[in-house]
């Protein structure tokens, strides 16, 4: 018989850098999860991903056990990494902070495709392009 789910927690944590400090500790502590066990498992699973921010969904069960699913980094994070930017524009319609070409958009869309709500790379590319525009990045 399946375990009874008592909670779902969504977090974004840098790869390989989970520790009991906020936001991880308080989020897991209120559900009674062994925080150090989660940190060890997460760090082991994401160690090879560099310093990317990894969204995760943690499922907590009634017996205080847990499972978690790692997702691909957010599109904005992938765009900033591709263009070597600190952040997007504060006024995206006026101030442009960089240019991204279609090859970079396609690479990001291919990376992010399993987590997006679309089936074709072309539709994923339009989502990535929309995110880039909202960050103040021109599409070349």
From Swiss-Prot:
<dbReference type="InterPro" id="IPR036796">
    <property type="entry name" value="Ribosomal_uL11_N_sf"/>
</dbReference>
<dbReference type="GO" id="GO:0003735">
    <property type="term" value="F:structural constituent of ribosome"/>
</dbReference>
<dbReference type="Pfam" id="PF03946">
    <property type="entry name" value="Ribosomal_L11_N"/>
</dbReference>
<dbReference type="InterPro" id="IPR000911">
    <property type="entry name" value="Ribosomal_uL11"/>
</dbReference>
<keyword id="KW-0488">Methylation</keyword>
<comment type="subunit">
    <text>Part of the ribosomal stalk of the 50S ribosomal subunit. Interacts with L10 and the large rRNA to form the base of the stalk. L10 forms an elongated spine to which L12 dimers bind in a sequential fashion forming a multimeric L10(L12)X complex.</text>
</comment>
<dbReference type="Pfam" id="PF00298">
    <property type="entry name" value="Ribosomal_L11"/>
</dbReference>
<comment type="function">
    <text>Forms part of the ribosomal stalk which helps the ribosome interact with GTP-bound translation factors.</text>
</comment>
<comment type="similarity">
    <text>Belongs to the universal ribosomal protein uL11 family.</text>
</comment>
<dbReference type="InterPro" id="IPR006519">
    <property type="entry name" value="Ribosomal_uL11_bac-typ"/>
</dbReference>
<dbReference type="GO" id="GO:0022625">
    <property type="term" value="C:cytosolic large ribosomal subunit"/>
</dbReference>
<keyword id="KW-0687">Ribonucleoprotein</keyword>
<dbReference type="GO" id="GO:0070180">
    <property type="term" value="F:large ribosomal subunit rRNA binding"/>
</dbReference>
<dbReference type="InterPro" id="IPR020784">
    <property type="entry name" value="Ribosomal_uL11_N"/>
</dbReference>
<dbReference type="InterPro" id="IPR036769">
    <property type="entry name" value="Ribosomal_uL11_C_sf"/>
</dbReference>
<keyword id="KW-0694">RNA-binding</keyword>
<dbReference type="InterPro" id="IPR020783">
    <property type="entry name" value="Ribosomal_uL11_C"/>
</dbReference>
<keyword id="KW-0689">Ribosomal protein</keyword>
<keyword id="KW-0699">rRNA-binding</keyword>
<dbReference type="GO" id="GO:0006412">
    <property type="term" value="P:translation"/>
</dbReference>
<protein>
    <recommendedName>
        <fullName>Large ribosomal subunit protein uL11</fullName>
    </recommendedName>
</protein>
């Amino acid at each position: 018989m399946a375990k009874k789910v008592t909670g779902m927690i969504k977090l974004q944590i840098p790869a390989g850098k989970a520790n009991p400090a906020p936001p991880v500790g308080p989020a897991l502590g209120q559900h009674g999860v062994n925080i150090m066990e989660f940190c060890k498992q997460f760090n082991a699973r994401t160690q090879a991903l560099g310093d990317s921010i990894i969204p995760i969904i943690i499922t907590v069960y009634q017996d205080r056990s847990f499972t978690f699913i790692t997702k691909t980094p957010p599109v904005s994070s992938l765009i900033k990494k591709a263009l070597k930017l600190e952040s997007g524009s504060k006024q995206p319609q006026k101030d442009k902070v960089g240019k991204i070409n279609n090859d970079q958009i396609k690479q990001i869309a291919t990376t992010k495709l399993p987590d997006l709500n679309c089936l074709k790379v072309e539709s994923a590319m339009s989502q990535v392009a929309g995110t880039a525009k909202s960050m103040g990045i021109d599409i070349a």
